[in-house]
């Protein structure tokens, strides 16, 4: 992939255009992770946010900010290799743009930094056809996904339009909330990652998960997927189970208005193959599991040898997760869990739904047109295949989602 163009006018970009080599003693703050690439991501995000905190925030973004990057190379024999690789490179794409997006999504840079650097991100077994790997930040607020160099190029192609869309909708969207994009190099291994806000709640567990495209051809989870603790189910699974999303008329109206606006934006950019990710929290089930957990904890305490339990260290995940005021069962903070919607009063079960659009970086190009032609021959022209043109895709997607909300 071609490296994004010249750095242009942003203050940060002009400071970081040239390659830096750092020979510094490792500070007290450690970035321990089982994977060296994760350690480098933690180090890089920490470095980036610290750099941004010293930069004057421009009144408006300039065209060159959408091509800018900052890059740093570290060669340091003083680093403790148990905690950090001694040689690595870290590159951040369009730092001022993503800083501006975080602000528009109501995310404070210090909070973002803490979420990604205080403790190592947690692996997530979510499957992607592309082979992408997923992690969540330790506090479960953000998702870190590996992407391809083609995805990075597509992100650069749409970033200006995406930013404008976020400005126009005042940050209230069902699109992925893109918060940072990075390249990491360690020991000859190069990966690209993108950070987004987690669609699911950071505290309410999801017991059912669906990836919905509005297509019925080959849209069923495999037996291997279904064997997982939390499988990603698909359209035919949703239909065959008779699943519905029970939200009241006002919540439905607001949701569909946002969805329509976002999907029209994607169609204009000729983007397709996106999905609605749906997570369902069962309030009564979660309460029951909590009671069982407390009973088990009580039994274990009764069997203890009388010594005092070790307290939660200040930097541990538990400390931050429990720092917010306690919420009643099924309640959530809408400033954090922005995609959450409660079920209506007549729902057969008391549920909370977390729904947003994911995987928006597929452009309708010659490859997709060829795939559409091949599938149409195989399944027939009227079949509900997923590779249709962006206008058809968006219409079918909106129709399907409209029908599952009740």
UniProtKB/Swiss-Prot annotation:
Residues 33-405 form the PIPK domain. The keyword rRNA processing does not apply. The modification Phosphothreonine is found at residue 3. Gene3D superfamilies: 2-Layer Sandwich, Phosphatidylinositol Phosphate Kinase II Beta. One of its GO terms (molecular function) is 1-phosphatidylinositol-5-phosphate 4-kinase activity. GO terms for biological process: 1-phosphatidyl-1D-myo-inositol 4,5-bisphosphate biosynthetic process; autophagosome-lysosome fusion; negative regulation of insulin receptor signaling pathway; phosphatidylinositol phosphate biosynthetic process; regulation of autophagy; vesicle-mediated cholesterol transport. It is an enzyme of class 2 (transferase). CDD domains: PIPKc_PIP5K2A. The modification N6-acetyllysine is found at residues 89, 145. This is Phosphatidylinositol 5-phosphate 4-kinase type-2 alpha. It comes from Sus scrofa (Pig).
């Amino acid at each position: 992939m071609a490296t994004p163009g010249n750095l242009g006018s942003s203050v940060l970009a002009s400071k970081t255009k040239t390659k830096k080599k750092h020979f510094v003693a490792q500070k007290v703050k450690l970035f321990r992770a089982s994977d060296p690439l994760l350690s480098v991501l933690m180090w890089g995000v920490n470095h980036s946010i610290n750099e941004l905190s010293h930069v004057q925030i421009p009144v408006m973004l300039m065209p060159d900010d959408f091509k800018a990057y900052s890059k740093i190379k570290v060669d340091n024999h003083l680093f403790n290799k148990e905690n950090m690789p001694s040689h690595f490179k870290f590159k951040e794409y369009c730092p001022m743009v993503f800083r501006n997006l975080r602000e528009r999504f109501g995310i404070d840079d210090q909070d973002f930094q803490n979420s990604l650097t205080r403790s190592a991100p947690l692996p997530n077994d979510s499957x992607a056809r592309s082979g992408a790997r997923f992690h969540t930040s330790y506090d479960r607020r953000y998702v870190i996904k590996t992407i391809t160099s083609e995805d990075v190029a597509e992100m650069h192609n749409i970033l200006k339009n995406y930013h404008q869309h976020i400005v126009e909708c005042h940050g209230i969207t069902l699109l992925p909330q893109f918060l940072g994009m990075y390249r990491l190099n360690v020991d000859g291994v190069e990966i690209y990652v993108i950070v987004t806000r987690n669609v699911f709640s950071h505290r309410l567990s999801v017991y059912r998960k669906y990836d919905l495209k509005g297509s019925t051809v080959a849209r069923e989870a495999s037996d291997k997927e279904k064997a997982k603790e939390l499988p990603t189910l698909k359209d035919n699974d949703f239909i065959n189970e008779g699943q519905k999303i029970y939200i009241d008329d006002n919540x439905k109206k607001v949701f569909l208005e946002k969805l329509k606006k976002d999907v029209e934006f994607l169609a204009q950019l000729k983007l397709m193959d996106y999905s609605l990710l749906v997570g369902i929290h069962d309030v009564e089930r979660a309460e029951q599991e909590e009671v069982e957990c407390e009973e088990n904890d009580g039994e274990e305490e009764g069997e203890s040898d009388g010594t005092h339990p070790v307290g939660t260290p200040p930097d541990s995940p538990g400390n931050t997760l429990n720092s917010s005021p306690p919420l009643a069962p099924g309640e959530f903070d809408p400033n954090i869990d922005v995609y959450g919607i409660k079920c209506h009063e007549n729902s057969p079960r008391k549920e909370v739904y977390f729904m947003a659009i994911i995987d928006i970086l597929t452009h309708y190009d010659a490859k997709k047109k060829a795939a559409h032609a091949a599938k149409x021959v195989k399944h027939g022209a009227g079949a509900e295949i997923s590779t249709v043109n962006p206008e058809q895709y968006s219409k079918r997607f909106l129709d399907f989602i409209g029908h599952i909300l009740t």
